[in-house]
Amino acid sequence: MVLPAHLQNSLMPSEVSFLAENEYITILPRYSMKKLELIGTKVPTLRGMRREKIPIWIAVILKSQDKCNIVPPEWLNLIYLKEKYEEELKQPHKFSVLPWNWLEISKILLNKAADDLSDPTHQLRSIIQDLREIRLVKSRKGLKELNESNIQLDGLSLLEINELRPFVLTVMNKLRQLHESVNTKTDRGTGNDQDDDMYHDVSDNE
């Protein structure tokens, strides 16, 4: 299957989500379970009410079977996210530090483990959306300061970079073409000046 042009140079949303699901998260098992050997990962022996870290995708499966509760990451709460939002407002040229997959993990937990979150989900969704929007505005403003060789995207998450990448590549290609065009004109101008100097030298000798 041929991907649309805007997706050929970036990951699909499902691929970004897949990568996020492989990160580890803490769970609180409701029952004891024997160790599992899976392709590419292992699930340690689980004991009831004893915290353990496992991949998010496994935690979601166990959660759906009522076999565990998911312990939310320290950053997934209203106080922390509001602080980050304030940081974004105070630092117009810098992004606040957030986990690499904060958007995807937030989405997964809000959809699959809402009852394990300490704050109302509608408030969490609201502040996450506000945070995402202000970071998007800042990143687009930052594109105005692009040059043809690099762009500074420190602090952005994988999903945020992935969403910007097609546009960034297009802009950088245009800037590179413009840069090359200016250099070509400059080289031609230098060549003409040298020809003029040679002409004057010949005239003086005559």
Curated annotation (Swiss-Prot):
Pfam families: PSF2_N (PF25005), Sld5 (PF05916). GO terms for biological process: chromosome segregation; double-strand break repair via break-induced replication; nuclear DNA replication. Its main location: nucleus. Keywords: Chromosome partition, DNA replication, Nucleus. GO terms for cellular component: chromatin; CMG complex; GINS complex; nuclear replication fork. SUPFAM superfamilies: GINS helical bundle-like (SSF158573), PriA/YqbF domain (SSF160059). Residues 182-206 are annotated as: Disordered. Residues 197-206 have a biased composition (Basic and acidic residues). It is found in: Nucleus. Belongs to the GINS2/PSF2 family. Component of the GINS complex which is a heterotetramer of SLD5, PSF1, PSF2 and PSF3. This is DNA replication complex GINS protein PSF2. It comes from Debaryomyces hansenii (strain ATCC 36239 / CBS 767 / BCRC 21394 / JCM 1990 / NBRC 0083 / IGC 2968). The lineage of its organism: Eukaryota, Fungi, Dikarya, Ascomycota, Saccharomycotina.
